[in-house]
Every structure is written in C-alpha cells, then in structure tokens.
Amino acid sequence: MASQPPEDTAESQASDELECKICYNRYNLKQRKPKVLECCHRVCAKCLYKIIDFGDSPQGVIVCPFCRFETCLPDDEVSSLPDDNNILVNLTCGGKGKKCLPENPTELLLTPKRLASLVSPSHTSSNCLVITIMEVQRESSPSLSSTPVVEFYRPASFDSVTTVSHNWTVWNCTSLLFQTSIRVLVWLLGLLYFSSLPLGIYLLVSKKVTLGVVFVSLVPSSLVILMVYGFCQCVCHEFLDCMAPPS
C-alpha cells in the first residue's frame, strides 16, 4: 500500500486544523471564528453560543466539551474570548497553510489574549512560548555630527543663587580682612605699651624730655587708671547692693 506524499499529508493536517471538532464545519472570519479556551482547545464561536443556549454551563463560565475545564467568560460574551490568530492568518491567506508576512514584522503587540491565541492547541505538551526580540540599529543621518551634543539646563533661579553665593563670598572676605586688621592693631598697641618704658628712658637720655616723660608715664598712668576703674566698680556694686530692697 503506497503511502501518501508528505505534501498531501501536510495539506490534510492543515485542513483538519481549519475545522471545528464539534460541528466539523470550517472556520471562517464571521460567525465561526476560532475561539481559544483556557485549556487551549479550539471551538468555533457558533458552537460556543449553542453551549451557552443549552444551559449546560454555569453563568459566566463555559465548560470545555473535550476536557470539561471551566473557562471564565469575560462580560458574558463569547466575542471577548481570544481568537486563534494562527487560524485567522491561515484563513486570510486562503486556508492552504501558507504563511503570510505581516505588514509590519518588526512590531508585535503582546497582550494576554494575544499570547493565549499564540499557543497552538495541537501542541498541548508544550507550555513554553519563546519570543525572540532583536534590536535593529538605525543608520545615523550623515548630516549629524558624530560628536555627542550635550544640552545644559539652566534654571531661572540659578542666577539668583549664584548672586547670593557671590555676595556671601564677598562678605566673608571682608569680615576676615576686618578681623585680621583688628588683631594686627591690638598686637601693635600691645607692643607699643610694653615697650613704652624703655623707649621713654631712651628719649630722656636723648634730651627729648617731653616725649620721654609721656612714654615713661604711660605704663604707671594706665595702671592708675585701671586701679581707679576697679575701685569705682567696687563702690558702685556696694552702692547698688545697699539700695536694693531686702528680699
């Protein structure tokens, strides 16, 4: 007995895939669209409507006539179930198992319904879906330079921040200069004060009596002033203590 050629066998298998296994009618793009259940079995939409009309399934659920697996029916509409896109493409191409190239092969919309329809019910032993994603490098325009262009964003408030920072820097420099000048002046006055006695003696020896007397009397006069100031401060404290009312 001669075996059938592989081409005829493939065509017969393809034609079997295009038929509903309940009514054995050919799928079409109108009333008999191939619907995929959650158990990956295919049933035409017309048979699903009949199953719902017979009342064999609970409300909002369709029981698979092959494996009795319950599939939730979104919005209680058969049209909400995902279509088998492989069968639809085959029907669009003439139903002879030919592969049609999509209009845009580089783009594929992945949704739960689309992924469910991509799983072929005839291969129930495989529960794996392999998706290959390739990145196509676009050719750069010759008018564009190879040097990357970097744009800097300068907010409006950045100028005010810069001005405040500049003013703060100037203020710090001025304050530091003032403090340094005060320290130098204090050191010079201290050096002049402690060297006034030997300097006055030197001026007296040099016959400069007036300046010599001033410098010589600087240290004793300052000490007398400090003593008078301390005495007056003590007297004021005692006077305030006497004038204060008793507690």
Swiss-Prot record:
Localization (cell): Membrane; Cytoplasm
Listed Gene3D superfamilies: Zinc/RING finger domain, C3HC4 (zinc finger)
Any one GO biological process: protein ubiquitination
EC number(s) on file: 2.3.2.27
Pathway recorded for this protein: Protein modification; protein ubiquitination
UniProt keyword terms in alphabetical order: Cytoplasm, Membrane, Metal-binding, Transferase, Transmembrane, Transmembrane helix, Ubl conjugation pathway, Zinc, Zinc-finger
Primary localization: membrane
Reactions that this protein is recorded to catalyse: S-ubiquitinyl-[E2 ubiquitin-conjugating enzyme]-L-cysteine + [acceptor protein]-L-lysine = [E2 ubiquitin-conjugating enzyme]-L-cysteine + N(6)-ubiquitinyl-[acceptor protein]-L-lysine
GO cellular component: cytoplasm; membrane
Transmembrane segments: 184-204, 211-231
Assembly: Interacts with ATP6V0C.
Described purpose of this protein according to its UniProt entry: E3 ubiquitin-protein ligase that mediates the ubiquitination of ATP6V0C and targets it to degradation via the ubiquitin-proteasome pathway. Also plays a role in the inhibition of TLR-triggered innate immune response by mediating 'Lys'-48-linked ubiquitination and subsequent degradation of NF-kappa-B component RELA.
Identification of the protein by name: E3 ubiquitin-protein ligase RNF182
Organism this protein belongs to: Homo sapiens (Human)
